[in-house]
Amino acid sequence: MQKTNKFLKIGNKEFKSRLLVGTGKYSSLEVMQKSLINTKCEIVTVAVRRVQGLEHGHKGLMESIDWKRIWMLPNTAGCSNAEEAIRIARLGRELAKLAGQETNNFVKLEVIPDKKYLLPDPIGTLKAAEQLVKEGFTVLPYINSDPLIAKQLEEIGCATVMPLGSPIGSAQGIRNAANIAMIIAESRIPIIIDAGIGVPSEAAQALEMGADGVLINSAIALAENPILMAQAFSKATEAGRDGYLSGRLKENPLASPSSPLDGVISNN
């Protein structure tokens, strides 16, 4: 993507904030509400299956968020194959309409058959993405940090790709920076790092690398003080983006004095 300070553009929508936030795992809806405010986010993910099933922590979720201010990103969490993900994506679009977002065709596509490490299925993701793009969805697929899959998803019309930093909820940070750097370098669509980020400095690292945004859930929701951590991630995301735009000092194997040596008083 071009090195610019314009808004984050996904599909035909523009957003000031580059921090996307999940809505799961909070101790209460009140903590979630206050945390979302502190993140200054404009996009939140909602697990369609969990909201519909009124699972613990999701009852009352739809009524707890100001959908006039925040854009809903329905996700297909819990889907293990392409067919299931396509069906849930369609339900997600209806959920967004119920929230008053009639033109919202966004979907965070997750196809995860692996229950231990929660790694996405590249073949199922590609299959589901292709169909959803045909149906007019703005598709944001969650993927492994595989440059080839990222490029294929871009070519079929996905609005962004969301490579994982490390497994979901693991707080291991960005373990595959080289692959993610390749994806960023070769992409013409926004890259949003999703999963594995545990602390604000890792969010800053992602933005400094040139990623267009980050999606955070567990690192905020499960922090000792989620509301304060939300604020920290907001600041880190802004700092990381500014650092990227500023152009970092290049690494050098040799030292370089901060003060010039010309004119230094000698002992002679």
UniProtKB/Swiss-Prot annotation:
Assigned GO CC terms: cytoplasm
EC number: 2.8.1.10
Active site: K108 (schiff-base intermediate with dxp)
Compositionally biased region (Polar residues): 255-268
Binding sites annotated in the UniProt record for 1-deoxy-D-xylulose 5-phosphate: G169, A195, G196, N217, S218
CDD domains in alphabetical order: ThiG (cd04728)
Primary localization class, coarse: cytoplasm
Presence of keyword Transferase: yes
Chain residue ranges for the region called Disordered: 248-268
GO biological process: thiamine diphosphate biosynthetic process
Reaction(s) the record says it catalyses: [ThiS sulfur-carrier protein]-C-terminal-Gly-aminoethanethioate + 2-iminoacetate + 1-deoxy-D-xylulose 5-phosphate = [ThiS sulfur-carrier protein]-C-terminal Gly-Gly + 2-[(2R,5Z)-2-carboxy-4-methylthiazol-5(2H)-ylidene]ethyl phosphate + 2 H2O + H(+)
Keywords (A to Z) from UniProt: Cytoplasm, Schiff base, Thiamine biosynthesis, Transferase
GO molecular function: thiazole synthase activity
Matching InterPro entries: Aldolase_TIM, Thiazole_synthase_ThiG, ThiG
Role summary: Catalyzes the rearrangement of 1-deoxy-D-xylulose 5-phosphate (DXP) to produce the thiazole phosphate moiety of thiamine. Sulfur is provided by the thiocarboxylate moiety of the carrier protein ThiS. In vitro, sulfur can be provided by H(2)S.
Family of this protein: Belongs to the ThiG family.
Subunit text: Homotetramer. Forms heterodimers with either ThiH or ThiS.
Protein name, UniProt field: Thiazole synthase
Organism: Prochlorococcus marinus (strain NATL2A)
